[in-house]
Amino acid sequence: MPQTPSTRWCPTPEQLMILEEMYRSGVRTPNAAEIQQITAHLAYYGRIEGKNVFYWFQNHKARERQRLRRRLCARHQQQPSPPSSTVPPAPTAAAAGAVVQVHPAVMQLHHHHHHHHPYAAAAAAQSHHLQQQQQQQAEWPAAVDYCSTASASASATAADMAIPPCCRPLKTLELFPTKSTSGGLKEDCCSSSKSSSCSTSTN
């Protein structure tokens, strides 16, 4: 019986090395143009698709957040009162600019092998702004203390208070609840004071 070839992506060591180097240089969420450029470059080292690049960055960010959360939980358990921190506001779409921006690390990677790329002039002009923006975004997750940002509710028991919020098991919300919640959401909303957030008017 002939075996069908696996469709799963198996990155080569060169592909992994390049992706990790780009991640360390600040590329966290490449846009579509960057993903195309990265994919084209990595194709020299083996089979790869754009979705592989996209998912690699998503997974790498998720693993980094998990590691950070574990470290913060361990630190929280060692010292009972961690310093509180403020979370900076997320950048808006207007701050990012309307022009498609290419991360300097992607341009450096691309420029290294392809000297006459049409995006090179536009990306070089915007690289300084984008580099600052990526650097800020890279610093934000480290500034967030996941163990101290979640506050316990007044109805929390003493046992719940002993476990830091980041270390408690996650609660799964039912997508389609089988029990009615005190008469239903619409009744609760509209029986309370008539506020603009509860209005059910149609446009």
From Swiss-Prot:
GO biological process: plant organ development
Keywords for this protein: Developmental protein, DNA-binding, Homeobox, Nucleus, Transcription, Transcription regulation
Tagged with keyword Nucleus: yes
Bias-annotated ranges (Pro residues): 80-91
A GO molecular-function descriptor: DNA-binding transcription factor activity
The keyword Magnesium belongs to this UniProt entry's keyword annotation: no
Low complexity bias (residue ranges): 119-135, 190-203
Biased composition (Basic residues): 109-118
Residue ranges: DNA binding: 4-68
Tissue and organ expression note: Expressed in leaf primordia, young leaves, floret meristems, floral organ primordia (except carpel primordium), stamens and carpels. Does not show polar expression pattern.
Similarity comment: family membership: Belongs to the WUS homeobox family.
Protein name as catalogued: WUSCHEL-related homeobox 3
